[in-house]
């Protein structure tokens, strides 16, 4: 599991989104295979021209500036209960060694050459664009600093280096960022050498999700020869970065550098004969990125991996962005949502739930809304929190005294056809397969919906049977109580990746041992029998 953080003065909600989505899948794997170690890499990309200029503007040395910013993302990850096992910074010496090793390996294969290169350069995106990838706009409010909610553009949410009203601006069609014409001597990577292999890979496997993104990559690879990639910048223009091995007048291109953090984080280059590599976390099972940096991860990184003789990523999740009133979040527009403020106001798990429930389809951009956040807070509070308090009320507990115990199997058989109890047990029996299928297909929102649907049915069952009411037969009180607690137990296990603190408190209150909070215990215990007194706790 791998996700990286760009640097920012203050992280916005899009940064938290990527971390939470990656964390959900990491925690899911820990539940699914508790004996398998999950390596979860997060971190910050800290080189590049924009960082260099921003540090200069603040009168700080770049390393001091980067340390301050990286600390913000560590704080974000810690507050959001992100379960990363590794946090890498591209300014670490171990990362420099990885970049230098990869450069030398590619150079020794004749894949790197020096050439004069001209193109449209974006400081924000830290890359060159061709004539076909840019356009001229007469918009006087052209955005100089484009702050996407993706999480791998190294400096996507730093304040603009300059933001000046201009009569016309040349911008990237892909990102909307301003570009300037540059001509300079750079080192180039023979990207076209890997085009046939990449095209074969993507036409024979389902690697990228959502599928439309894989279609886009196949179209790029099929539409004509790939241009070789500029992988260095003159030291005179970019001093803040990894020096090119054996050429101190050149600095390694920030994306060549940044993409290799996936390898440096798990110790590449591995020493021969150590057995490391696959056992250390490669190939990665899943990378979580923003859709705007897809080509870096779907073309550039795989080309480098092929050159190194390493297997490609197994799956690549390129999620959509969070917007404000259908506009991309941008400090220059003043519409950046503060994740710390949201978590302080609504609670960490409520924000995590909202990001997954609303943003878990990944196909289309989603609008960040305080109103919607409040709505989903009430949803999970009602469906889960209130259900737990209702079914464990003292009035219902007292009605269970002396009642004859029955198993869930017996309750199911004794329930009338079409009754709420029978519907709930049937839905609960189907939940594990529905949930797992959605998670395995990277459909986070659908997985949550499956849980909420069962919880909603459990609430209906409690309403229909009214176990607190004196007219309800004791055996019906017992049936509803037993089924509802089993629903909460299974829902609690499934909800651990999404709302870990709340799920833990629920399972503790239900008396579920830690070793029993894994996938093999998600199946309905149809043989469960006996009244168990449970004291409800407030979850939200």
Residue ranges of each PLM-predicted region?
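Short, surface-exposed loop/turn segments at secondary-structure junctions
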Residues: 85-89, 366-371, 469-478
